[in-house]
Amino acid sequence: ALAGTIIAGASLTFKILDEV
């Protein structure tokens, strides 16, 4: 479960960085 949260967080961060 923790790994999934980390992956989701990393994916979200990457999406935000890509949007900038």
From Swiss-Prot:
The answer to keyword Cytoplasm applying to this record is no
Q: Name one GO molecular function term.
A: toxin activity
**Residue span of region Plays an important role in the hemolytic activity:** 1-10
Q: Where in the cell is it found?
A: Secreted; Nematocyst; Target cell membrane
Q: Region N-terminal region: start and end of each range? A: 9-20
Q: Which UniProt keywords apply?
A: Cytolysis, Ion transport, Membrane, Nematocyst, Secreted, Target cell membrane, Target membrane, Toxin, Transmembrane, Transport
One further remark on this entry is: Hemolytic activity is 3.6 x 10(4) HU/mg. A synonymy between H.magnifica and R.crispa is controversial.
Name the family: Belongs to the actinoporin family. Sea anemone subfamily.
Q: How does it assemble?
A: Octamer or nonamer in membranes. Monomer in the soluble state.
Role played = Pore-forming protein that forms cations-selective hydrophilic pores of around 1 nm and causes cytolysis. Pore formation is a multi-step process that involves specific recognition of membrane sphingomyelin (but neither cholesterol nor phosphatidylcholine) using aromatic rich region and adjacent phosphocholine (POC) binding site, firm binding to the membrane (mainly driven by hydrophobic interactions) accompanied by the transfer of the N-terminal region to the lipid-water interface and finally pore formation after oligomerization of monomers.
Q: What remark about domains does the record contain?
A: Composed of a long N-terminal alpha-helix and a core region rich in beta-sheet structures. Before the pore formation, the alpha-helix binds the lipid membrane, partitions into the lipid-water interface and stabilizes the monomeric molecule on the membrane. Finally, it traverses the bilayer, thus forming the transmembrane pore.
Put simply, this protein is called Magnificalysin I
> Organism source for this protein?
Heteractis magnifica
